[in-house]
Amino acid sequence: MTHERQQRQRDPRAAQCLALVFALPAWCLGDERAAAEKVNALAQAGNDSITEQYQPAQGISGRVTIVGSDTMQPLMAKLAAAFKSFQPNTKFGVEGHGSSEAIREFMLGLSLQHRGDKSGGKGTQGASSSDLLASSRPLTEQERKGFVSHHGYEPIGIPIAMDAVAIYVHNDNPIQRLTLEQIDGIFSSTLKRSKGGHLTTWGQVGLKDQWSQQPIHLYGRNKKSGTREFFKHVALIDGELHEDVQEQPGSASEILAIAQDPLAIGYAGVGFQSSMVRIVPLAHEAEGAATLPSAETVANGRYPLARPLYLYVNKNPKEKLDPAVSEFLKFLNSRQGQETVARANFYPLTAAQISKNLELLGQSLVTARYNGR
């Protein structure tokens, strides 16, 4: 990465500009009717409907600490804010520094979050453990075993939204479609899909004229990212990323880098789309139709890089779950919770997925009334 680009990324004015750029699309999606229509569209695609309204329990208070995915941080912040509109006596701490690092914290019952309410500890550190883990990938078997080894019981994991990892290019790039084989040829050093070798110029993926000899500049996420692991697993068939990938600490910084580089290509969650960049339609195979991520193409599997977003709960089976955490989980699986997912530019769950979640969580977690206890 050039010194000039590093300076631009450290410029606080660039960060402020980026915050505005990403706040605007999310705000535009905030219309209640649009969110409801998105939920209904997905329900129709799956021949089901999400009808259960959130019924707030009385007397809920306390603090909920969530660690996890950079991709999910904006989603969790919006869900927390929506929940607080029903339960104003609750407080939330949401960290989003990457799934892989957060999983380690969750396994060990740690949180690096500073807090000023002084509850649950002395001084400003306060939060010594995380209640929930937001992860853009499922826990590995080794990670599950690590959690059990430390806590003595299994974590509870549920999907709370659907997402798609999108392929982003500069807004001026005319590329109309890519296949998974081409994605492997562009990003991978191990080429488990690609039969045509490494693809290093835009002409090799179909662009002509002044684009044909231009090099492809690669951008991606760093090793703390669950999105990176998902991309390697699905798009590259557990292959390795090319050493030329310029790894970024977060999705927002990656999108900013792509917006500043006309020859760029990168991958990030669909929730980070903006007017500065463009999402490329993807096809499973060369002869197949290329699709953009949408509620329908994610639900029916036509979009190749669809994925669930997970929330893991640290619940000792011998103890009652904290009322604030339990009520928040109930909210996530309600119509209002899933409409918040839609407003955050992610895709809501189907009713079948909601039903499985409620069954897994158990009746005591999602329907109990605590009355302040």
Model regions and ranges:
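Structural motif marking the loop-to-transmembrane transition
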Residues: 11-14, 215
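Bacterial N-terminal signal peptides
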Residues: 16-26
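Flexible loop/hinge segments at secondary-structure junctions
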Residues: 31-373
